[in-house]
Design a protein with these regions (language model features):
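Trp/Phe/Arg-rich N-terminal binding region typifying the photolyase-homology
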Residues: 52, 60, 66-69, 76-82, ...
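A short helix-loop-beta-strand connector motif used in the catalytic cores of GNAT acetyltransferases and
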Residues: 45-61
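A short glycine/small-residue-enriched secondary-structure motif
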Residues: 36-40, 72, 78-90
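Acyltransferase donor/substrate-recognition loop-hinge adjacent to the catalytic core
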Residues: 3-4, 150-207
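Acyl-donor binding region in acyl/amide transferases
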Residues: 82-164
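Glycine-rich, histidine-containing beta strand-loop boundary motifs that form or position
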Residues: 72-76, 93, 123-128, 169-171
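Conserved beta-hairpin
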Residues: 56-72, 161, 167-170
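Short amphipathic alpha-helix that is part of the acyltransferase structural core
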Residues: 2-47, 196-207
Length: 207
């Protein structure tokens, strides 16, 4: 078994590895829906993401030999910590192969950086602000996902909990009951929108 090495992303070459890793990890997973690469890059661009005016972050990659096997971002939102009187470091963009040690080393890297910055608490997965995606999928792995929802394999929460992390709250990403009767109000709104914008439904045939 190769030793797991954690490295901090400090250049464009490593940042590309960070962006590309999920495409390798989930290449055979039909449930995974990738984020737009442009959006991911913008999120970490201090010139384009206003949140980075009050957030510090570090990106870590886990290696097994020359191969990237995991990634994570540690974030300190100074504005949030000041408002809520907390000393929290956040973690997000946590992706890793199905090995406890990889996740452990990644989270330890975030924890250690947090301690060095005076933080006393860690929480995640989160983004830079509370307007970003938050949480980890714990049920519904068989359901289709979208770009707007979180997706992760079922081993993620299992491994994180084995590392003594505790769930704080349960959220429902989305729930649609297809057998419910559609209210008349929805039909009226639908017709108004179609008339106002001159819309029509076109059914295409597959090739």
């Amino acid at each position: 078994m190769n030793t797991i090495t954690i490295k901090t992303v400090i250049n464009k070459k490593d940042f590309k590895k960070f962006i590309d890793f999920p495409y390798t990890l989930f290449k055979d997973d039909k449930k995974w829906v990738p984020s737009l690469v442009m959006d991911e890059k913008t999120t970490f661009d201090k010139k384009k993401n206003p949140a980075l005016e009050f957030c510090d972050f570090k990106i870590f990659l886990a290696y097994k030999g020359p191969e990237v096997v995991g990634r994570v971002v540690g974030m300190i939102n100074h504005k949030s910590n000041e408002i809520w009187k907390e000393k929290r470091i956040r973690f997000g963009w946590l992706d890793f192969i199905n090995e406890d040690i990889v996740c452990q080393k990644l989270l330890e890297a975030v924890e250690n950086w947090g301690r060095s910055e005076g933080m006393t608490e860690i929480v995640g997965p989160m983004g830079f602000t509370d307007m970003d995606k938050e949480g980890m999928l714990v049920e519904g792995f068989e359901e289709d996902c979208t770009m707007a929802t979180y997706y992760n394999p079922s081993y993620y929460p299992q491994i994180v909990e084995r590392l003594s992390y505790k769930k704080e709250v349960d959220w429902i990403q989305y729930r649609i009951k297809a057998n419910q009767e559609i209210p008349e109000k929805i039909f009226r709104i639908n017709n108004l929108i179609k008339e106002k914008y001159n819309l029509r439904i076109v059914e295409g045939l597959s090739a």
